[in-house]
């Protein structure tokens, strides 16, 4: 399973009620660093598909979600587990750093 688009409409069901941890990528199509880590996020979605849900939130299309989560720079990665925020990282990061955000929650 690849990444899914997270919206205000599906946030509660896909993130807060998820039985597995959820890695959220707040991004925008005009963001250079977002374009750099986008393929890495997609790789992680494929490699951890049985243990982790990966969602992408386009801040241009979902400004209310970005504001609710206090997103001030992108990319920003958040990890939710059992309906609560468990980890976060702002800025582009190498794959191993992204994996370390959620590895101990699996």
Predicted regions, residues:
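Non-catalytic, surface beta->alpha helical segment in thiol-disulfide oxidoreductase systems
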Residues: 78-106
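Conserved helix-turn-beta segment immediately C-terminal to the redox Cys motif
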Residues: 19-21, 38-57
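Conserved Rossmann-like nucleotide-binding pocket used by diverse enzymes
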Residues: 2, 7, 27, 53-55
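Short pre-active-site segment immediately N-terminal to redox-active cysteine/selenocysteine motifs
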Residues: 19-20, 26-30, 73
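A short beta-strand-turn-helix
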Residues: 3-22
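Structural microenvironment flanking redox-active thiols in thiol-disulfide oxidoreductases
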Residues: 59-65
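Conserved redox-active cysteine motifs that mediate thiol-disulfide chemistry
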Residues: 26-40
């Amino acid at each position: 399973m690849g990444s899914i688009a997270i919206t205000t409409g599906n946030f509660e069901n896909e993130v807060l009620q998820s039985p597995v941890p959820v890695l959220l990528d707040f991004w925008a199509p005009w963001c250079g660093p977002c374009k750099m880590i986008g393929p890495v996020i997609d790789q992680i979605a494929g490699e951890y598909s049985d243990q982790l849900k990966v969602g992408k939130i386009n801040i241009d299309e979902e400004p209310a979600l970005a504001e609710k989560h206090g997103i001030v720079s992108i990319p920003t990665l958040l990890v939710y587990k059992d309906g609560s925020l468990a980890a976060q990282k702002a800025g582009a990061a190498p794959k191993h750093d992204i994996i370390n955000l959620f590895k101990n929650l699996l």
